[in-house]
């Protein structure tokens, strides 16, 4: 299964505890995370910790990490310019690009949402307004 994730240190924390020898074990535990509903915690934890699953991090999410780091809302152990690529490499996260076609399609579809991540409130979700997800080997949760 391939899963697209939002800018969430919880995902990296869970995956790194499984795959990295030098794991980041910060306070972002899933049972305390505001975006994880109580009934989704165990399912999300199992999916993320299963190293047979792939985790994708969008360029937009990496940008949000950098913005939140700069604003002091997300204090990672090092500047986001080095933290994000290093964490992606160490935890086996693959990049997911967001290009102009994605943003243009959101506007053309007449969606009232100003976000290109309309389902970001659900853990491990990504949404496309058409069948773009069928072009990638991505299972949607």
Swiss-Prot record:
Keyword Magnesium: yes
Entry cofactors: Mg(2+)
Presence of keyword Magnesium: yes
Annotated Mg(2+) binding sites: 99
Listed InterPro entries: TA_system_RNase, VapC_family
EC number: 3.1.-.-
Record's keyword terms, sorted: Hydrolase, Magnesium, Metal-binding, Nuclease, Toxin-antitoxin system
Chain segments carrying region Disordered: 99-141
MF (Gene Ontology): metal ion binding; RNA nuclease activity
Family matches, as PANTHER family: RIBONUCLEASE VAPC16, RIBONUCLEASE VAPC16-RELATED
Family membership noted in the UniProt record: Belongs to the PINc/VapC protein family.
Function: Toxic component of a type II toxin-antitoxin (TA) system. An RNase. The cognate antitoxin is VapB16.
Protein name: Ribonuclease VapC16
Gene this chain is encoded by: vapC16
């Amino acid at each position: 299964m391939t899963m697209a994730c939002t800018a969430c240190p919880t995902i990296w924390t869970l995956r790194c505890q499984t795959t990295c020898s030098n794991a980041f074990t910060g306070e972002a535990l899933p049972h305390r995370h505001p975006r994880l509903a109580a009934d989704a915690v165990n399912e999300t934890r199992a999916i993320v910790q299963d190293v047979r699953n792939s985790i994708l991090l969008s360029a937009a999410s990496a940008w949000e990490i950098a913005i939140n780091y700069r604003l002091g809302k997300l204090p990672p152990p090092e500047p986001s310019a080095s933290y994000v690529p290093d964490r992606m490499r160490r935890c086996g996260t693959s990049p997911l690009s967001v290009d102009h076609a994605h943003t243009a399609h959101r506007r053309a579809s007449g969606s009232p949402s100003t976000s290109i991540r309309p389902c970001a409130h659900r853990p491990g979700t990504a949404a496309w307004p058409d069948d773009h997800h069928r072009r990638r080997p991505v299972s949607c949760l």
